[in-house]
Amino acid sequence: MNFETIIGLEVHVELNTNSKIFSPSSAHFGEDPNANTNVIDWSFPGVLPVMNKGVIDAGIKAALALNMDIHKEMHFDRKNYFYPDNPKAYQISQFDEPIGYNGWIKIKLEDGSTKKIRIERAHLEEDAGKNTHGTDGYSYVDLNRQGVPLIEIVSEADMRSPEEAYAYLTALKEIIQYTGISDVKMEEGSMRVDANISLRPYGQEQFGTKTELKNLNSFSNVRKGLEFEVERQAKLLRSGGVIRQETRRYDEANKGTILMRVKEGAADYRYFPEPDLPLYEIDDAWIDEMRAQLPQFPAQRRAKYEEELGLSAYDASQLTATKVLSDYFETAVSLGGDAKQVSNWLQGEVAQFLNAEGKTIEEIALTPENLVEMIAIIADGTISSKMAKKVFVHLAKNGGSARAYVEKAGLVQISDPAVLVPIIHQVFADNEAAVADFKSGKRNADKAFTGFLMKATKGQANPQVAQQLLAQELQKLRD
């Protein structure tokens, strides 16, 4: 029997506000344990939450970016559970009235086609703390993350393969990153993914029993975990077994999933309205204000790059991978840079330098103005493409004018025949044996002079002009 794969994803995105959702503590990542906490985070008796307006702003932006309807009257709920990293014994979340609902995004499949993936809801909530189990037999609780604002984005079960799930996550990450509400860095926990997967016989309308996957710390592991589950569940069903509703984690070392616990249902959390927070009204003016702050998104930019700038689909996709890179590219083109040349540099030398240095493009000294000027002096013959690589490294580290650096460092190409011809004559005088070989008709003897000339000019002779002049002067030797 063959089975159809059904996948839905729950994505937790940490919002990059300065303070937490209900307390004034810093929400910044990387501090010493429990440094970013106060009495609200520790849930001392009598403390009350105070809503961070910036979190609602971010929620509205996310809902708009994901083509969602927005609840004009929004409230919070208590999700009750006990765990050491949750000192209140409940989490403030949203249950029946999330900030956004009925959304969708389009994903691009491997065959080049597109597919719409529906998004059920996006709700705001507070993050929990973090437990660390030490080798000394003790467990430690760090509440720096407690109360950090999250938006949980829940897709419909519209994905039919691990590859579609991967494409959905890639598209979702791009969109959220463009809004500016999160840096979506999985390595820092600001984007976390839980996957729900089930199988059903082809032609059956009813979904099978789902399994939830956790510990998916990269998009690659999401795909690998789902691929493993497809095989595990299909094998179990074909042998007459029954799929239980359970939570499993992906074990990277063993390339498989491991049972964590039997899955709870929503009723186990005993949701009820949060009594310490009011109803929040979101009017059209607020929504319009947030909409005005949104940028043009990747899909629209890719279409523009292909249709207006003549770039390939691949180049357009690479240039829109992050908003910072796309903005950099657009600035360079607006300053007169040739779109294809700017694209080539950003995907070539610039990308290699960033990878080697472990930096992002906004962390280096090369500005779009610097890059455009450098491309221009390559085009006008001031420097060669080979010399440009040296110039680029200097500009990436130090910034400044490309032309000014080239002139100061003595890197300007020699293109003037009045300068090059005497140097060629000196090369002939200094290499009598090579001249004799050439005159005697020795095969490829003329090629040696190119190297001699480049050495004599310390690589600064314009290659095209040099070849032309060499050919003329060698012909005179032959005559």
Curated annotation (Swiss-Prot):
GO terms of molecular function: asparaginyl-tRNA synthase (glutamine-hydrolyzing) activity; ATP binding; glutaminyl-tRNA synthase (glutamine-hydrolyzing) activity
| One GO BP annotation of this record | translation
A Pfam family this chain is assigned to: GatB_N
Q: Which PROSITE patterns match?
A: GATB
Query: Which superkingdom is the protein from?
Result: Bacteria
Q: Which InterPro entries does this one have?
A: Asn/Gln-tRNA_amidoTrfase_suB/E (IPR017959), Asn/Gln-tRNA_Trfase_suB/E_cat (IPR006075), Asn/Gln_amidotransferase (IPR018027), Asn/Gln_tRNA_amidoTrase-B-like (IPR003789), GatB (IPR004413), GatB_C_1 (IPR042114), GatB_Yqey_C_2 (IPR023168), Gln-tRNA_amidoTrfase_suB_CS (IPR017958)
Alphabetical list of Gene3D superfamilies matching this protein:
1.10.10.410, GatB domain, N-terminal subdomain (1.10.150.380)
Q: Tell me its EC number(s), please.
A: 6.3.5.-
Q: Matching SUPFAM superfamilies, A to Z?
A: GatB/YqeY motif (SSF89095), Glutamine synthetase/guanido kinase (SSF55931)
User: Which reaction does this enzyme catalyse, per its entry?
Assistant: L-glutamyl-tRNA(Gln) + L-glutamine + ATP + H2O = L-glutaminyl-tRNA(Gln) + L-glutamate + ADP + phosphate + H(+); L-aspartyl-tRNA(Asn) + L-glutamine + ATP + H2O = L-asparaginyl-tRNA(Asn) + L-glutamate + ADP + phosphate + 2 H(+)
Query: Which family does the record claim for this protein?
Result: Belongs to the GatB/GatE family. GatB subfamily.
Could you describe the subunit structure of this protein? Heterotrimer of A, B and C subunits.
**What name has this protein been given in UniProt?**
Aspartyl/glutamyl-tRNA(Asn/Gln) amidotransferase subunit B
- What is the species listed in this Swiss-Prot or TrEMBL entry? Streptococcus pyogenes serotype M12 (strain MGAS2096)
